[in-house]
Amino acid sequence: MEKLQYELQGYLEIDRYRKQRFLYPLLFREYIYALAHDHGLNSSIFYEPTENLGYDNDNKSSSLIVKRLITRLHQQNHLTISVNDSRFVGPNRSFYSQTIPEGFAGIMEIPFSVRLVSSLERERIAKYHNLRSIHSIFPFLEDKLSHLYYVSDILIPYPIHLEILLQTLRTRIRDAPSLHLLRCFLHEHHNWNSLITSNKSISIFSKENQRLFLFLYNSHVYECESVLVFLRKQSSHLRSISSLAFLERTHFYGKIKHLVVTPRNDSQRTLPLWFFKEPLMHYVRYQGKSIMASRCTNLLMKKWKYYLVNFWQCHFHLWSQPGRIHINELSNHSFYFLGYLSGVRLTPWVIRSQMLENSFMIDTAIKRFDTIVPIFPLIGSLVKAKFCNVSGYPISKSVWADSSDSDIIARFGWICRNLSHYHSGSSKKHSLCRIKYILRLSCARTLARKHKSTVRAICKRLGSKLLEEFLTEEHEIVSFIFRRTRLRSERIWYLDIIRIHGLVPHS
């Protein structure tokens, strides 16, 4: 694998590539498909193991099949392979339909990858692993939002046509043959599975070509945020690199001290003067949902709202309704983000002051960033996973009844520990206790269904073994640091969470 990466690096150093950005010949290199299959390209920075991304590992990479594939690519009159072609029907059909887009996605990522590495080296941004954690967002919000007044909850619109995705890539990739081949892939896939419809978000991809469409969606979101580039250049920022796709990252925009307007050739993209009256703007995003907060007035936030809507409609032909951007006052509103209901709460305090022989009481209020876990979205996720009914009553997981007892307990315990680990930042743990109760009782009902017994008999037979599996090691360690009474209200953020659990409703 190191030899393949060394050969690829040698190709990237060719002057012709630097001048013309000619990527199309890479499609005929065997090592590209090997790198794409096991995600060797930039795997240490950007990607999780293959099994975590939902790829089918049964189709092993075959050098002979790849050589035949490249030979047929050379023989094609058009720059695409039809899935209905009789030469590709058979046991290797799924391999062809998956390998070509995966290899092509790896090729398309090369210019962005080189640009990202060079920018990290130029700006001397340290690659701290704890910045990859999703929980690293919340300490930033806790530090900043308590001083702000308004928050804007934004849903980034998804493209309504495949051609829009290609138009956004033209400014980044100057290789016409590669873009033409990508257009063929998109139209073929659009005809196969009707990928993008008015009822489904583009973020829901088929597992076959997940890497390619994740790349396209992330490049689309990156372009939608281009209006905020001027904030990024003039702000102190902190990057959290997501391991799912390298363009999907979370930017932390800190306080802006000096803001300079950069002239642009396109007069329509010139930012209005009212943008710079209040430079204190904070922005954070995860996938297609972003939060923008500021100390500015409600009128200025509304101007931001309509500017974003018009910007997306005029320059990206995206139909973004103003109702997708909600503006609320932080002191009276909580916003849902990454599975937490976050807001700023006023905590009353009574301070006793004494001056000489006179003493008096002072009533004051302190703003505090508060995060809680809403119970109903979590129960809704458990209902979809068939752990309980709509009323929150635990039911047995019938599809797991054929597994061994230890396997069933381990599965339920793993889910419970992960949910507790992710929601450890909640200031109120009552909802988590209810989720743990549902999972424990669902586990007991599953075991009772398997052995045709009762829940009481199962709990009596297993005893403490059933309870110990649902306790986390972190809970035992933290209990030594904080007292039990304080632990119920203490927020704990872990810096090792790089992905959201499937049961966490974050959209």
Curated annotation (Swiss-Prot):
It is found in: Plastid, Chloroplast. It comes from the Eukaryota. Keywords: Chloroplast, mRNA processing, Plastid, RNA-binding, tRNA processing. GO terms for cellular component: chloroplast. Belongs to the intron maturase 2 family. MatK subfamily. Usually encoded in the trnK tRNA gene intron. Probably assists in splicing its own and other chloroplast group II introns. This is Maturase K. It comes from Nymphaea alba.
